[in-house]
């Protein structure tokens, strides 16, 4: 069984691709061979990579968004994601990294102050040490998106806007076992 939070048992990648609603990676431009994760097929599937490929081909800007749950020590899995984001940044992506402190608060039962400290000391510092450029990036906390009123509720506005495009079953296929705290975050 695989969810974003846990892996147990033997991994059936074909089943995983089907369950998570993703597509296997096919031919990619040569520049992707420069990245170990793509070259070694550690990144083996995608959702909408054709949008990135089109933007690169047409020399148009594109963005990548990822998130992290500040639940503990930075580990190999976090490093692999950081390396992937660094690669996209080098290709010209503007990055958005959301710290899922509200989700961690609901699932890990730590204070928001503790979670903020872990996010900065364990994740952000390591991202920068691995080569993430502080330029062309927005690193923010769910609990405190911005002092700018236009951005402060952007997370919830986006979630509300996108929610009409996703069904509960699609959400569950992406995130696995869920509770109200995970849905809300």
Model-derived segments and their meaning:
Residues 1-68, 137:
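Non-catalytic terminal extensions that flank enzyme cores
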Residues 46-56, 86, 125, 182-184:
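Short, charged beta->alpha transition segments
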Residues 64, 95-100:
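Short beta-strand segments at enzyme active-site cores
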Residues 69-79:
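Short, glycine-rich nucleotide/cofactor-binding loops
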Residues 98-108:
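Short connector loops at secondary-structure junctions
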Residues 112-185:
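Divalent-metal (Mg2+/Mn2+/Ca2+)-assisted nucleotide/phosphate chemistry catalytic cores
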């Amino acid at each position: 069984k695989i969810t974003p939070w846990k892996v147990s048992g033997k991994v059936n990648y074909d089943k995983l691709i089907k369950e998570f609603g993703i597509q296997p990676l096919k031919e990619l431009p040569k520049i992707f061979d420069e990245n170990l994760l793509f070259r070694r097929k550690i990144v083996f599937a995608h959702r909408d990579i054709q949008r990135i490929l089109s933007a690169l081909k047409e020399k148009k800007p594109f963005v990548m968004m990822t998130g992290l749950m500040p639940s503990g020590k930075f580990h190999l899995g976090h490093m692999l994601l950081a390396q992937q984001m660094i690669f996209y940044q080098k290709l010209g992506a503007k990055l958005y990294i959301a710290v899922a402190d509200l989700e961690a608060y609901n699932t890990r039962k730590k204070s928001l102050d503790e979670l903020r400290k872990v996010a900065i000391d364990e994740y952000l510092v390591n991202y920068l040490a691995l080569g993430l450029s502080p330029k062309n990036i927005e690193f923010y906390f769910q609990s405190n998106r911005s002092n700018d009123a236009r951005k402060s509720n952007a997370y919830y506005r986006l979630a509300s806007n996108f929610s009409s495009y996703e069904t509960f079953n699609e959400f569950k296929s992406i995130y696995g076992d869920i509770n109200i705290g995970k849905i809300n975050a």
